[in-house]
Amino acid sequence: MQVLLIATLVASVLAAPTEVSPQTSGGGGGGGGGGGVCRGFLYSNPICCATDILGLACLDGDTPPETPRDAKNFKEICAKNGQQARCCVLPIIDQAVLCIRPLGV
């Protein structure tokens, strides 16, 4: 039973998209929202993550302290604290489940 559960989890992770394209701010204006760095329905939560465990879990992670403009800015914001930029499915109390790198990072 446990083997079936683990196999199902691994299969679902492998079937998920591996990269998420960043959203452009649309030009003009003073910048856009940071909601575009993690696009897509599932991987929509930007997280600065200290430890990424094979994309299955992100330990000691939190939302970025400032709103990222794009994927490069997202990476820079997280790097200031020695963390990695990730787009995750489910953030829960300083951890997140199923995380990927945003496109351009």
Swiss-Prot record:
Null mutant phenotype: Results in reduction in aerial mycelia, conidiation, hydrophobicity and infection ability, and complete inhibition of pigmentation and primordium differentiation.
Keyword Secreted set for record: yes
Biotech / industrial applications: Cordyceps militaris is one of the famous mushrooms in East Asia widely used for his medicinal properties due to the chemical constituents present in the mushroom, namely cordycepin, cordymin, polysaccharides, glycoprotein, ergosterol, and other extracts. Fungal disease of Cordyceps militaris caused by Calcarisporium cordycipiticola is destructive to fruiting body cultivation, resulting in significant economic loss and potential food safety risks. Overexpression of HYD1 leads to enhancement of disease resistance with negligible effect on the agronomic traits of Cordyceps militaris.
The encoding gene: HYD1
Induction line: Highly expressed during the whole fruiting body development with a 13.14-fold increase at the sclerotium stage compared with the hyphal stage. Expression is regulated by the GATA transcription factor AreA.
CDD domains associated with the record: hydrophobin_II
Species of provenance: Cordyceps militaris
Family, as annotated: Belongs to the cerato-ulmin hydrophobin family.
Disulfide bonds listed in the record: C38-C87, C48-C78, C49-C58, C88-C99
InterPro entries with a match to the protein in the record: Cerato-ulmin_hydrophobin, Hydrophobin_sf
Function: Aerial growth, conidiation, and dispersal of filamentous fungi in the environment rely upon a capability of their secreting small amphipathic proteins called hydrophobins (HPBs) with low sequence identity. Class I can self-assemble into an outermost layer of rodlet bundles on aerial cell surfaces, conferring cellular hydrophobicity that supports fungal growth, development and dispersal; whereas Class II form highly ordered films at water-air interfaces through intermolecular interactions but contribute nothing to the rodlet structure.
Quaternary data: Homotetramer. Further self-assembles to form highly ordered films at water-air interfaces through intermolecular interactions.
Protein name from the UniProt record: Class II hydrophobin 1
Annotated signal sequence range: 1-15
Pfam families from the UniProt entry: Hydrophobin_2 (PF06766)
